[in-house]
A protein has these predicted regions:
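Short loop/turn segments immediately following beta-strands, especially the blade-tip
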Residues: 115-120
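Beta-strand signatures of extracellular beta-sandwich domains
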Residues: 111-113, 333
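C-terminal tail/sorting-segment detector
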Residues: 349-360
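Residue-level detector of functionally pivotal "anchor" positions at catalytic/ligand-binding pockets or at interdomain
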Residues: 312-338
């Protein structure tokens, strides 16, 4: 032990350090972890580090909010999945449409990025291309949230204490190349009375840019009371808080890394992991869809893992247009060129399984 210490060598552990925590507004901001008006960014990162050590939840807020962590060692890129991210996703006990076969419940997918470099401020970031990357993900979504000027106000929506609580403005490019923009408000619910604005952030606005995943919630009661948040498919992969912690789809392969043009990048190891809330969605009384994380695991430190690693089949980048018949009986999901799912496709061009499909 003396020799190892003298040489500057230390054992690798599963302990992570939170180096950045910048949630977007959300119902559990300032509570997971706790923060006050006097809390600094450094202090909230320390609190988040302690929470993750105990596998307690960290709330990232609505779209764009993120956390960045670092192990006490680089994570190696070896065969199969390289690390696991814990969340709080679960399946619905009673799905009125799909019953026990449901792939829905509470799944709030976060996009995962990996960083290479010695400094979080200057490292090179790469997105891990999940199952929706080449089909329905929007890659240039930008949103600005405005700090609320009051914590209560006019409210007519159910379970609201302030309908026009936090103003937001968003821009993006649709799949057909059309430039889009939208403006609206997040309401404040009666269930969480603290401010939803992160108290350690300076300034009057927060802006987030990056990939955005398609909405995944369906209100199944017809009365606004029962929201089900679905996985994109049984074999959907590549997103945090989007599957059960124990299954293979909560693991991530560094080989999924792509550059800004969606091209594969070979990485020997990574130094940082960033998780970003990937959906911009509001579900009535349930509130915003917000990714939560509860831990990170370097799989290569798990005894015996490398002898039988998890290998997840991936969707390839579309290379052309295939042709199928409109009366096909195959159980395949189709999306239009804006990323919206089409249940009964007619003649035209769609995206399916990562490829452009022409239905005649």
């Amino acid at each position: 032990m003396f020799l190892a210490t003298a040489m500057g060598v230390s054992a690798q552990t599963q302990q992570v350090t939170v180096v950045e925590l910048h949630p977007a507004p959300g119902q559990f901001v300032n509570t997971l972890p706790a923060a006050t008006a006097e809390t600094t960014h450094e202090e909230v990162c320390e609190a988040a580090t302690e929470s993750l050590a105990d596998e307690e939840l960290i709330h990232l807020g609505t779209y764009g909010g993120y956390i960045t962590v670092q192990f006490d060692h680089p994570v190696q890129n070896k065969k199969g999945s390289d690390f696991r991210i814990l969340g709080n996703g679960f399946y619905a006990a009673s799905d009125p449409v799909y019953g026990s076969e449901t792939i829905g419940g509470s799944f709030e997918p976060g996009i995962v990025y990996v960083g290479v470099g010695d400094d979080v401020n200057t490292c090179k970031w790469y997105e891990l291309a999940g199952s929706e990357y080449y089909t329905s993900e929007i890659h240039d979504f930008s949103i600005t949230y405005h700090k609320p000027t009051a914590e209560s106000g006019d409210h007519k929506q159910p379970f609201s204490t302030f309908d026009n609580y936090i103003k937001w403005e968003a821009t993006w490019t649709a799949k057909d190349g059309t430039k889009r923009d939208s403006t609206g408000y997040h309401m404040k619910t009666s269930f969480h009375k603290q401010t939803y604005w992160p108290l350690w952030e300076e300034g009057e606005t927060l802006t987030f840019k990056g990939g955005k995943l398609p909405n995944n919630a369906i209100e199944q009661s017809g009365k606004g009371s029962y929201w089900v948040l679905y996985r994109y498919a049984k074999d959907a992969y590549g997103y945090a808080d989007a599957s059960l912690n124990k299954d293979q789809y909560s693991t991530f392969d560094i080989d999924w890394a792509v550059d800004e043009q969606g091209n594969h990048v070979d990485l020997a190891e990574i130094n940082y992991i960033k998780v970003v809330t990937g959906i911009f969605q509001y579900c009535g009384w349930l509130g915003e869809t917000s990714t939560e994380v509860a831990g990170f695991v370097d799989l290569h430190l798990v005894p015996g893992y490398d002898d039988d690693p998890i290998i997840i089949p991936v969707k390839q980048r579309p290379t052309g247009v295939a042709s199928v018949r409109a009366d096909g009986k195959d159980d395949v999901r189709y999306y239009d060129l804006t990323g919206r799912r089409v249940v009964n496709p007619t003649r035209g061009i769609y995206i399916s399984n990562g490829k452009k499909i022409m239905i005649k």
